[in-house]
């Protein structure tokens, strides 16, 4: 099983949460203050640099759910899935955008979508 940190439309009560299907919700949590959330219009993205905390949820997902999320999130061509540093040493992966292409979008200072 894999742990996946979601911070946008995959969260509970958002449009793409049903993609997580049989995944097990673990908890609401936040990252360490090492990232930047940006506003892409219909959805957010995070950059692997900055000083913001990102708020989201952690799920335990099997490989089939993870593959579906990869497809929806465009991994590895749009988003890249990699380890994210969460509070209390929780280990999970999240989807990041490449900073070089997305550093001109509006920043969501609160880190909350």
Question: Positions of the model-derived regions?
Answer:
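Glycine-aromatic micro-motifs
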Residues: 1-113
């Amino acid at each position: 099983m894999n742990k996946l940190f979601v911070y946008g439309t995959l969260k509970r009560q958002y449009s793409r949460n049903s993609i997580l299907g049989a995944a097990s919700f673990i908890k609401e949590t936040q990252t360490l203050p090492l990232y930047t959330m940006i506003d892409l219009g219909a959805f957010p993205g995070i950059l692997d640099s900055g000083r913001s905390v990102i708020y989201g949820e952690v799920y335990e997902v099997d490989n089939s759910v993870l593959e579906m999320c990869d497809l929806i999130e465009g991994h590895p061509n749009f988003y890249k899935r990699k380890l994210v540093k969460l509070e209390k040493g929780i280990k999970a992966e999240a989807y990041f955008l490449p900073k070089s292409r997305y550093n001109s979008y509006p920043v969501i200072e609160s880190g909350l979508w």
